[in-house]
């Protein structure tokens, strides 16, 4: 796929993104997970061929989209980046595909701007509006000091092990994280918590495909994904075998088949 590498500036950061135009008015936008970059979706691009305009980015603080010295990652700034990108291309409606952090961002966009989204595909991410247990709330409060207790190289290695089953996926995650500073990674993880708000009555107003690796060991994702799907008539869940947290990289064949099928449903 012929992707054009471009940038735009917003809130003190040069955001790098990749764009493919088509004759169609339909857009698909890929949103990667924390610590990763746009390359994680390489195996999903062939699904869309010439039928869609495609956008991928390196979110602020990730990949080529470097934060300036003493600048702190903000989930709210990332939302603003996304909306600026949509404004730039006059996108009125898009399919959002988000993995982990990207899935949290996609949920937040649907919550704030429902008319901007036609469908969501959420890969290995938690529910923004889910109810947390007391132990989960405690772990969130303790996570920052726990992260700082770990040497950065240990944190990189353990994060990579948690993300993938496949050795190539683990190597990719290590490569991505090695380009970040420890403080920046922790800032990202802490800022993600700002999108969590308990609202058990909330239901998605658009069709949503939930994909979860059967071996996902990240947070509460594997535990909550089935009850999440059961509670929302607009959600379709598929567990991906032989896949961890980065299910789209561990088992792209199964993920691509699920996405292609979902795209054809009303």
List each model region and its residues.
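Gly/Ala-rich beta-loop-alpha elbow adjacent to hydrolase catalytic centers
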Residues: 98, 102, 106
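Flexible "cap/lid" loop of the alpha/beta hydrolase fold
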Residues: 107-111, 118-147
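Conserved loop-alpha-helix segment in the C-terminal half of the alpha/beta-hydrolase fold
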Residues: 209-243
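Conserved alpha/beta-hydrolase catalytic His-Asp/Glu region
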Residues: 131-133, 149-203
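Active-site loop/oxyanion-hole signature of alpha/beta-hydrolase fold enzymes
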Residues: 55-97, 257
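Conserved HGGG/HGGXW glycine-rich cap/lid loop of the alpha/beta-hydrolase fold
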Residues: 13-67
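Catalytic histidine-centered segment of alpha/beta-hydrolase-like enzymes
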Residues: 243-252, 256
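Alpha/beta-hydrolase fold catalytic core
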Residues: 1-29, 51-52, 92, 260-266
């Amino acid at each position: 796929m012929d992707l054009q590498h471009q940038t735009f500036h917003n809130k003190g950061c040069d955001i790098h993104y990749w764009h493919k135009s088509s004759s169609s008015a339909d857009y698909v936008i890929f949103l990667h997970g924390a610590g990763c970059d746009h390359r994680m979706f390489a195996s999903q691009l062939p699904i869309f061929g010439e039928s869609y305009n495609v956008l991928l980015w390196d979110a602020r603080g990730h990949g080529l989209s470097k934060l300036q010295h003493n600048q702190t990652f903000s989930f709210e700034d990332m939302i603003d980046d996304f909306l600026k990108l949509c404004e730039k291309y006059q996108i009125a409606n898009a399919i959002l595909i988000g993995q982990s952090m990207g899935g949290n961002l996609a949920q937040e966009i649907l919550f704030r701007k429902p008319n901007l989204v036609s469908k969501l595909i959420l890969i290995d991410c938690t529910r923004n509006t889910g109810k947390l247990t007391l132990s989960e709330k405690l772990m969130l409060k303790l996570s920052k000091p726990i992260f700082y207790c770990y040497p950065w190289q240990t944190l990189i290695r353990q994060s990579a092990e948690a993300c993938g089953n496949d050795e190539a996926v683990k190597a990719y995650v290590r490569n991505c994280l090695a380009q970040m500073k420890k403080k920046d990674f922790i800032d990202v993880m802490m800022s993600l918590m700002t999108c969590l708000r308990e609202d058990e009555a909330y239901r998605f107003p658009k069709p949503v495909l939930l994909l979860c690796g059967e071996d996902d060991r990240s947070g509460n994702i594997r535990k909550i994904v089935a009850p999440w799907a059961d509670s929302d008539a607009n959600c379709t869940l598929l567990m991906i075998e032989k896949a961890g947290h980065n299910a789209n990289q561990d088992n792209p064949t199964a993920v691509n088949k699920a996405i292609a099928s979902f795209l054809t449903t009303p």
